[in-house]
């Protein structure tokens, strides 16, 4: 199984990339994690709809066919660590590759959000995009550790 994190925005601070890389290398070989950063559409005088369309096209191009799409959305389902671990286990049992989508500064195209297989949220807080990448991969690693009985997660 592969977890694909698709994030709108190509540039993150070094600290965020270092933290992301640290968690990414902890995953076992049977659960590969890949990050695909797609370009943020330059704002200029474009409408939000134009921005959404351009970014959606890039996101869709980054996702292989047949991949389960899970978007991070402030209106998505709020999950506990245990619930995320159960979701991860379900995806693994189904053999699905999963793409977790982090939108750009203006969010995601509403139709794309609605078409996703699932919508989840990481927090009630507004977080910087670089922090979301780190928080997401850490929580995915934590979910894996719960399922694997690894001592990383403690009750």
From Swiss-Prot:
* Record's keyword terms, sorted: Cytoplasm, Methyltransferase, rRNA processing, S-adenosyl-L-methionine, Transferase
Under Pfam families, the record lists: SPOUT_MTase
Organism, scientific name:
Delftia acidovorans (strain DSM 14801 / SPH-1)
What's the protein here called?
Answer: Ribosomal RNA large subunit methyltransferase H
**Subcellular locations according to the entry:** Cytoplasm
Q: Which residues bind S-adenosyl-L-methionine?
A: 72, 103, 122-127
Q: Which gene encodes it?
A: rlmH
Q: Name one GO cellular component term.
A: cytoplasm
Q: What is the protein's quaternary organization?
A: Homodimer.
Where is this chain primarily localised? cytoplasm
Any idea what job this protein has?
A: Specifically methylates the pseudouridine at position 1915 (m3Psi1915) in 23S rRNA.
């Amino acid at each position: 199984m592969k977890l694909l994190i698709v994030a709108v925005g190509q540039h993150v601070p070094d600290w965020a990339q270092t933290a992301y890389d640290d968690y990414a290398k902890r995953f076992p070989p049977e659960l590969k994690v890949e990050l695909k950063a797609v370009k943020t559409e330059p704002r200029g005088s474009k409408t939000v709809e134009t921005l959404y369309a351009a970014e959606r096209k890039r996101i869709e191009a980054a996702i292989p066919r047949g991949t389960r799409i899970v978007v991070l959305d402030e209106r998505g389902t709020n999950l506990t660590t245990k619930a995320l671990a159960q979701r991860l286990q379900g995806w693994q049992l189904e053999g699905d590759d999963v793409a977790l989508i982090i939108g750009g500064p203006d969010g995601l195209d509403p139709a794309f959000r609605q078409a996703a297989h699932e919508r989840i949220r990481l927090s009630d807080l507004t977080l910087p995009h670089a922090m979301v990448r780190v928080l997401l991969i850490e929580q995915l690693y934590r979910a894996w550790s719960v399922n694997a009985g690894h001592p990383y997660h403690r009750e």
